[in-house]
Amino acid sequence: MTVEREREASGRVPGAVWRGTALQVLGRFWGAACTLAILWLASGALDGAGFGRFTFYIALFAWLDSVANMGTGQVAVQRTAAAPARMASVLAAARGIRVRAGLFGVLLCASFVLARDEADGAWIVLASLYPVTHALELSTIPARNALSWSVPVAVRAIAAAISLGNVLALWLAGVDRPALYLLGVALGSTVGNVLLHLASRHHLPRERGEAASESGFFREALPLGISALCAQTYFYVDNLFVEAWCGLEPLGHYNVAVRVMSWSIMLAQYTTLTVLPWLRREQLAGALGPALARLGPSLFAGAGLACGLALPWTGSLLALFGEEFRAAANSLRWLLGATTAIYAGSLFMTALVALGRNVASLWIAALGVLLNIGLNIWAVPALGIDGAALTTCATEVFVALAGAAVILRAGVSLGSPWRWLGGPLGLAAGAGLSSLLAMGY
């Protein structure tokens, strides 16, 4: 057993996990800066309704990403993290699913655009083709299994810059059509997937794999795919409620707050993405519990403290996009509460994948959707965009608690329960300290 393997077996977090996470967070900082710049440019170029429409379709495309991915990346890691000889056949199976699912997403988008009789609908449908190229992104699986993220992060940074460059060119040209801004963003993502494949080719098996040899791949991927769709649904379905009850302009304000939240959860997203191969190997070695107990509480507490410190300043942050965006300040406060919950929930849901509890992940996400829709039916008409944010917070708390319950029922210990109180306590302490600073103490 190697030294690194001994560390993994003892539940310690390998250095490669932290290096990979740090690289991804740095890349995400750049990507977030590009996204915020895109939103700032679009908010200036488009009228209130146009900007709301732009952010609506950005949210829809995020949902289409999950349609195209359909859980294939996670199952590919499940099957190859400890068995790299299966790489060729696994990639063949996963790519076939992604292409078909991506094209199905295009049909869904086209039907939606036709039903709404959208202006420039053809450009929107053209932009919706980019998720099909996620089949190329699977070429990074060998690097993910090796916890090596330098090339994928660099390529994603280039793709974000291309999207920003496209939007900047449209802004400089005085374009005021939301669909063309969507197309500019989608083009950057497409180029990024192509570059990821080209940069990762030398790590791929030379032989062609046979998808048929990976029996049951789609059956294993489907629960995870639907689970991811449910997660995207309860994250973005509030757009439909806000548009219907509040209008497109408040929707634009709300979606900027959601984008800030998306930026705030990046460490959770990329930590869980990085640790999945390691957690899978830990589970096979019978050491998943110590690994989770070592990684989770400190991450959760740090997230709570950071979100608490930001709570009094949400209005000032949103005002960077214009004074009118202060209307979403209270919404962002609720969303920061949701962020804290996500730092625990995302790790628990990743642990379920490591355990092979794919169906349990699906049930949790499906119940999250039902809870979210039920609360939105009441909260948005009663509280406006603040109600949508409150609903998101409640849903993420439910997902975190449900994930922890399933892990415990599987016989995996999460360590001392007191250590997991750091998230809410950090949120309260950070909010109190930051409020005192805001008052001049």
Predicted regions and their residues:
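Hydrophobic alpha-helical transmembrane segments
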Residues: I124-S128, V153-H203, L367-N372, I385-I407
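Membrane-interface junctions at transmembrane-helix termini in multi-pass inner-membrane proteins
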Residues: R79, V132-V155, L336-A365
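Interfacial segments at transmembrane-helix termini and the short loops linking adjacent helices
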Residues: V113-A127, L248, A310-T340, S346, ...
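Helix-loop junctions and terminal segments of transmembrane helices
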Residues: T35, L39, A68-A85, M261-G296, ...
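Signature of the first transmembrane helix
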Residues: V3, V13-G73, V106-C109, S163-L164, ...
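Interhelical loop/hinge segments that connect adjacent transmembrane helices in multipass membrane
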Residues: T2-V17, S150, A154-V155, G174, ...
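Alpha-helical transmembrane segments of polytopic membrane transporters and translocases
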Residues: W40-L41, F51-N69, G184, D238-L240, ...
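Transmembrane alpha-helical segments of multi-pass transport proteins
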Residues: A33, A173, G368-L371, T395, ...
